[in-house]
Amino acid sequence: MKLNIAYPVNGSQKKINIEDKNKVRCFMEKRIGQEVEATTLGDEFKGYVFKITGGNDTEGFPMMQGVGAPTRVRLLLDGRSGCFKPSRDGERKRKSVRGCIVAEDIASLQLIIVKKGDAEIPGLTDVSFPASKGPKRASNIRKLFKLSKDEDVRSFVIRRELPATDKRKAKSKAPKIQRLVTPTTVARRKALRAKKAARHTKASNEAAEYAKLVAQRQQAKAKRSVKVSSKKVVAK
């Protein structure tokens, strides 16, 4: 069985191939989301606790959370179910998936280190891969650096260094800050609100003038009809 182990603290991951089936007995009959002590895998894993996040069987069918079966089943899936990506809105399709219970015909398991053990695992816990990109949203940048709402977040954006190549010089890139509130955006929103209010006032004034004109026309029409009727009475 292949174990894809990830260590989110350091941002590292490693694939380990276990040939002895007796060593992976600790994962049998376990479900996705359960935590398992990995002492039986070897002395280097003593004290480690893994969390099962997924897996695939020998033919590549993925395990699906919420399917309480140790075998393969066929389900009608949509875009919200997982294990299926629709090509258009509302599309559904019947596909084969594995249950969330680990069985002997599982070929690979995805694991996350929840608790670190006594010894270091070479290539996994002794190395660190920092995130290459920082947050883009203004609120997330404030949360990362513990900034107040009055402080400007533009000077705290994490820049990414790009090495020099044959076609370009060394430079740095920064992401465009999303949902950034500046005096320019505040003035723009204020101008839009004022424009909308002026448009509403103009429309209401024009509607009042039109109603007044219609009332005058109706009064004039009523007077003309009264005069015509009086002339007819006199003629008789």
From Swiss-Prot:
It comes from Dictyostelium discoideum. GO terms for cellular component: cell cortex; contractile ring; extracellular matrix; nucleolus; ribosome; small-subunit processome. Component of the small ribosomal subunit. Part of the small subunit (SSU) processome, composed of more than 70 proteins and the RNA chaperone small nucleolar RNA (snoRNA) U3. The keyword Lipid metabolism does not apply. It is found in: Cytoplasm; Nucleus, Nucleolus. Ribosomal protein S6 is the major substrate of protein kinases in eukaryote ribosomes. The keyword Protein biosynthesis does not apply. One of its GO terms (molecular function) is structural constituent of ribosome. Component of the 40S small ribosomal subunit. Plays an important role in controlling cell growth and proliferation through the selective translation of particular classes of mRNA. Part of the small subunit (SSU) processome, first precursor of the small eukaryotic ribosomal subunit. This is Small ribosomal subunit protein eS6. One of its GO terms (biological process) is translation. Keywords: Cytoplasm, Nucleus, Phosphoprotein, Ribonucleoprotein, Ribosomal protein. Gene3D superfamilies: 1.20.5.2650. InterPro entries: Ribosomal_eS6, Ribosomal_eS6-like, Ribosomal_eS6_CS. Belongs to the eukaryotic ribosomal protein eS6 family.
